[in-house]
Amino acid sequence: VKQTLEDTRAILNIAGIENPKEIVFIVAPEWKWDAIHTAGQLADGRGQVKLNQLISSVMPNIPPESKKMGADFLKKWVLRDIPSLGPGWQSKYSLQIDEEEILSDSIEFFSNIFGCEISVVNADRARSRHVAKGNQSSPLRPAIFVS
């Protein structure tokens, strides 16, 4: 919740939005969590993961409609996210949390802070205007849609 609060404040600040009408937190779909868990199992002692090994392990389990996005996500995760997280990143992702439930339980908190309607949706169930933004979600980093 703390990281999502900080991320939302940063987005509002960068976009120059003082009075948002609505904020939607779009949490990562199950297959992204599964991919991260697999990456953790494949990581070497330094926390590095071979992209080709991860792709061959994970792609068969990604829903057909998400294959292209899945390949892009895995590539970004291995080449950018893992190096920025540093050694030992796997421990942060070892337990899957129900982000949708946690953020849903915090709707009133966020609504009081930002003074607008707050909703939480899983990227798998995102409505048309949220789909592109939902594709940016990762485990522990929901996509944030502001209007």
Predicted regions located by residue number:
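Basic, alpha-helical terminal appendages of large translation-related enzymes
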Residues: V1-S147
